Amino acid sequence: MNNLELEITSKAYNDMEIISEFIAKDNKSAASKMMRLFYKTFETFLKHPNIGTSRPDFTYMDVKFYVVKKNYLIVYRIIDNKKLRILRVLTTYQDVCSEL
């Protein structure tokens, strides 16, 4: 599983844009840092794809969850041991079940 291709869904891009805009209202530098951290985390997933946690209490879908900085939840899926798809980047304040 070392040669996974990264795919980021349009919903995940939209999630990150919303998060960035929200943070940037108070601190543009912090917003940029947060975006860099998300992308660094995606790179970590490519090296360690099973680092996330399955949560059957959240969803029946075969996805993994990974918390970033306590307030953000990355939802991703490994497809055919070839692709790592970032599905969503949510805040922990959102109703995760309804967002999936």
Predicted region positions:
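Basic, Lys/Arg-enriched alpha-helical interface segments
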Residues: 1-58
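A cross-family signal for key residues in well-ordered alpha-helices
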Residues: 17-20, 67, 88
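Short charge-dense sequence patches
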Residues: 25-26, 36-39, 68-74, 82
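Basic/aromatic recognition patch in beta-strand/loop cores that engages polyanionic ligands
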Residues: 50-80
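Residue-level signal for beta-strand positions within conserved beta-sheet cores that form or flank
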Residues: 2, 61-62, 82-85
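Solvent-exposed, flexible loop/coil residues
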Residues: 5, 55, 62, 94, ...
